[in-house]
Regions:
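Catalytic active-site module of serine/aspartate enzymes centered on a nucleophile-bearing elbow/loop
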Residues: 7, 14-15, 326, 334-373
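An N-terminal hydrophobic leader/cap segment in hydrolases
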Residues: 25-60
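N-terminal cap/lid segment of alpha/beta-hydrolase-fold proteins
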Residues: 50-71, 81
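Active-site loop/oxyanion-hole signature of alpha/beta-hydrolase fold enzymes
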Residues: 64-67, 75-82, 88, 128-166
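Conserved HGGG/HGGXW glycine-rich cap/lid loop of the alpha/beta-hydrolase fold
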Residues: 77-133
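The conserved beta1-alpha1 loop
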Residues: 98-102, 168, 193
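Flexible "cap/lid" subdomain of the alpha/beta-hydrolase fold that forms the substrate-access gate
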Residues: 143, 147, 182-186, 190-327, ...
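Gly/Ala-rich beta-loop-alpha elbow adjacent to hydrolase catalytic centers
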Residues: 167-171, 175
């Protein structure tokens, strides 16, 4: 005989589905909260481990009243310049070598170059405002602003000239503007696959449009998403999965650690947004006279057909030809003592891929600057 419990009505199917859906949503919400908390905790701990693993290389200097609240990191190594060099006697001047990085690369990116140059010269790399161990700087982030900050940094740090100045990629803009602003400081220059003030205008139309789209500032939603990914450790995880090629993993990990802060992202974006203004400042900087100059040019392109979309192999061949045979050659002619060297087995990141060629170029310009009357 059926019991009373057996005679209870069965809940409708719709009601059971609602119940299961509610439980599922509760479970997913709990899982999401757990993932967010776990990701944030992971990133919090990892950042503090980074601070222990990768202590500051160099020293921070406040730039003074002209640049309130701006502190830049300067990393100098090698022998101090001769204290009583007589500029009237050839061979007695000991220039200091100054290194300026490409867009998005902290001062530590010069490590392979700086370690070798320090064996024969005083050499300094620095983090531009917002990079590495430096504070954020005022907007706009043009090459003129960057040059003025570098000049103030060298003054407060007591790193006296003259200088052999070296610029990679966007750093080439900065060192040329610096030379135009402070010509008596500079006795020689090395440009390492350096940006050219006419490079955007000289690109084929398809690539110009693609690069313009790529350089369009991100939307507020994209910036928020990037910030969330950074705070939850997602950026860190993605970087850890990347191919480091032939570079030492410890070197790449330290570069990544310096690139993760929000201020770094803001600084690189600000420099990119001011690229056209910086190019105009380079045009106004003038030439180098008879200063020794070496232009290092990457022999290998960085893009493949279809990247960006719509770009053909012919477009890329045209870009490479214009870059190697025209724009880079024109930089060689900035000085009556200019020289160009193609680094056939390197792409754009010559300081990473062939640092020995950068060291050799610096050594040659350094020696020529010492011998100048």
């Amino acid at each position: 005989m059926a019991s009373r419990d057996d005679l209870k009505p069965v809940p409708p199917l719709r009601g059971r589905w609602k119940h299961w859906l509610k439980r599922a949503l509760q479970g997913l919400t709990g899982l999401l909260v757990l993932l967010v908390f776990g990701g944030a905790t992971y990133e919090f701990i990892a950042e503090r481990l980074d601070a222990r693993r990768f202590p500051q290389r160099g020293q921070s200097f406040q730039l003074g009243p002209q640049f309130p609240n701006v502190s830049l990191n300067l990393d100098c190594s090698g022998p101090a310049p001769a204290a009583f060099a007589d500029e009237s006697i050839p061979g007695t001047v000991r220039p200091t070598v100054i290194l300026d990085s490409g867009l998005g690369v902290p001062a530590f990116g010069w490590k392979f170059v700086q370690d070798e140059v320090a064996k024969f010269a005083r050499v300094c790399s620095y983090d531009r405002a917002g990079y590495g161990w430096s504070s954020e700087g005022p907007l706009p982030r043009t090459s003129l602003e960057i040059a003025r900050e570098l000049h103030a940094l060298l003054a407060v740090a007591g790193e006296k000239g003259p200088y052999v100045i070296v610029g990679h990629s966007f750093g080439g803009f900065n060192v040329r503007v610096y030379t135009g602003q402070y010509p008596s400081d500079i006795v020689g220059m090395v440009l390492v696959d350096a940006s050219h003030e006419d490079q955007v205008q000289r690109q084929p139309p398809a690539l110009r449009a693609a690069m313009k789209a790529m350089s369009t500032p991100p939307s507020d939603a994209q910036l928020i998403l990037a910030g969330v990914m950074r705070h939850l450790g997602i950026i860190r995880i993605l970087q850890a999965q990347g191919d480091v090629g032939k570079l030492p993993r410890a070197f790449v990990q330290e570069i990544f650690a310096l690139q993760r802060p929000a201020k770094f992202e803001a600084a690189t974006l600000a420099e990119l947004q001011s690229f056209a203004d910086s190019a105009q400042q380079v045009r106004a900087a003038g030439n180098l006279g008879d200063r020794p100059l070496i232009v290092l040019t990457a022999g290998q392109g960085e893009l493949a057909a279809g990247q960006p979309a719509g770009v053909t192999q012919k477009d890329l061949d045209d870009v490479h030809r214009i870059w190697v045979d025209e724009l880079q050659v024109s930089q060689m002619h900035l000085s009556t003592r200019g020289k160009r060297i193609i680094v056939a087995d390197s792409g754009h990141l010559i300081p990473f891929e062939r640092p020995d060629t950068v060291v050799a170029a610096i050594r040659e310009v350094y020696a020529a600057a010492q011998d100048a009357p």
